[in-house]
């Protein structure tokens, strides 16, 4: 199903993440209406054969089980996020509205790559290079009244039988832009974002994808813990991202579930990915 859906991410929707990721300088020339506004939308997958879409963006990158380690790169990090799947309403070639369908844990896995001109160049390096949970939770409202209001994002690195907290445990409601404010911002950027600096012309990509009925958006990465900021992924690690209801579980209970590999509760969106070498 996802292979027919245009997929995007949001840069700079948690204060401090871009600085930790070493990307703040790339966005230094990007003008925003207020300090907390995200910097840009970036593409991760465009379902199109058009020559106007870069070839790497035509490759479906999502997996719920593994991440293929990039060749000739060593600085690879988990980007723990909440992903939201929307129905898209179009009129006369413009996006008019977005209606939520489901949400889940996402790993917008990224290479810390010097010299990349566009954000997307650090995001998709082939098949099985990004993460999306197989347990997407139904969502009929994207507001303070929705079930998502109660959810938190947690992330972990599993290495040598140890569990390390990778991203700061954060409420979804604490994104800089969320609910209606984020929805309106997304619609504006999908229609009008220009090809400038690290940004790309998103509307042109959507046009080449024949104005898709559904759009997946990973709405921003949390800040890293001190461990997450300093430690890159290695082969045979496992990357874990969890979206869980705060009213039902505390952080320690989630850590225990990860340690015990108890991923059974359908109210929790778990994403567990093994870091693997590319098969020759």
Question: Which residues make up each language-model segment?
Answer:
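Catalytic nucleophile loop of clan PA
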Residues: 227-233
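Short, structured coil/loop segments at alpha-helix boundaries
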Residues: 113, 243-244
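Short, structured beta-strand/loop micro-motifs enriched in basic residues and often containing a Trp
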Residues: 199, 213-225
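Short, charged beta-turn/beta-strand-edge "cap" motif at the junction between a beta-strand
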Residues: 15, 221-226, 244-249
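Glycine-enriched loop-and-adjacent helix/strand subsegments that border the catalytic/binding cleft
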Residues: 3-209, 231, 253-279
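Hydrophobic beta-strand signal
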Residues: 218, 239-240
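Loop/turn positions that initiate beta-strands
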Residues: 212-214, 233-238
């Amino acid at each position: 199903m996802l292979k027919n859906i245009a997929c995007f991410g949001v840069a700079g929707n948690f204060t401090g993440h871009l600085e930790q990721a070493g990307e703040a300088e790339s966005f230094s020339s990007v003008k925003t209406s207020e300090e907390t506004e995200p910097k840009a939308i970036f593409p991760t997958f465009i379902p199109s054969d058009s020559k106007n879409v870069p070839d790497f963006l035509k490759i479906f990158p999502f997996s719920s089980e593994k991440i293929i380690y990039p060749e000739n790169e060593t600085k690879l990090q988990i980007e723990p996020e909440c992903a939201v799947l929307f129905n898209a309403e179009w009129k006369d070639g413009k996006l008019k509205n977005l209606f939520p369908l489901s949400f889940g844990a996402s790993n917008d896995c990224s290479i810390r790559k010097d010299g990349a001109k566009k954000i997307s160049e650090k995001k998709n390096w082939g098949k099985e290079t990004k993460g999306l949970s197989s347990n997407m939770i139904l969502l009929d409202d994207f507001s303070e009244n929705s079930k998502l209001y109660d959810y938190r994002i947690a992330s972990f690195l599993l290495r040598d039988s140890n569990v390390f907290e990778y991203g700061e445990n954060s409420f979804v409601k604490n994104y800089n832009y969320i609910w209606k404010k984020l929805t309106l911002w997304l619609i504006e950027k999908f229609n009008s974002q220009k090809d400038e600096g690290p940004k790309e012309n998103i509307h042109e990509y959507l046009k080449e994808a024949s104005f898709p009925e559904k759009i997946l958006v990973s709405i921003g990465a949390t800040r890293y813990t001190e461990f997450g900021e300093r430690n890159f992924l290695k082969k045979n690690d496992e990357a874990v991202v969890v979206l869980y209801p705060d009213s039902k579980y505390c952080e320690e209970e989630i850590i225990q579930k990860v340690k015990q590999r108890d991923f059974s509760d359908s109210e929790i969106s778990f994403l567990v990915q093994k870091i693997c070498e590319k098969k020759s």
